[in-house]
Amino acid sequence: MMLYLRSSVYAVLLLALAGCASHSPPVPKEVFIWQAPRQVLVTEINPKTIEPVVWQVVVQQQAGSLRWLRFNLLGAPDARQILANGKWRNDGFMPPNQKVRELFAALLFAWTHPRDLILAYPSPQYDVNVFMDKWVLKENSRLRWTVIWQNGLSQPNLFSIKDHKSGIIWQVRPLTNPDIK
């Protein structure tokens, strides 16, 4: 009886932990970055907070992978991730941060050339719609991200991304002050 009770408790704990595990944001198996700047400023507008937050995001191409870093405006890193073979892994001792992975994956979607989006996010799980100044990704028939390009693609580094799961909007612009590290 005690053994049965103990194994039942373990089973419940495992189910609870599995429920807490978050779904990774969509990333392509093969990375097709188009005109990706290495450094951008991202203003995060969260409907649940009063003030927007500004981050610096740095992307570094490494042999077969992309290294993603996010810093506050004082230069302190708060997230470091490596994307290799369609999988995220930690870079250094920073803890995993699902919210930041969502931002990084959304940026990767925005920086994928339109001709490569169908290959990068194949059906039936994903549905990609590309309009002149708006790109939409649906995952399992649900809106995931909408990218809206400011001034169309004439200025490909000015855009915003709406994360439909959280309601957060990220406004992206090139880093204009190289002194911010």
Summary of predicted features, one role per range:
Residues M1-Y10:
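Bacterial N-terminal signal peptides that target proteins for export
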Residues V9-L13, R101-E102:
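N-terminal trafficking/processing presequences and adjacent post-cleavage segments
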Residues L15-G19:
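C-terminal motif of bacterial Sec signal peptides marking the signal peptidase cleavage site
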Residues K29-L74, A79:
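N-terminal secretory signal peptides
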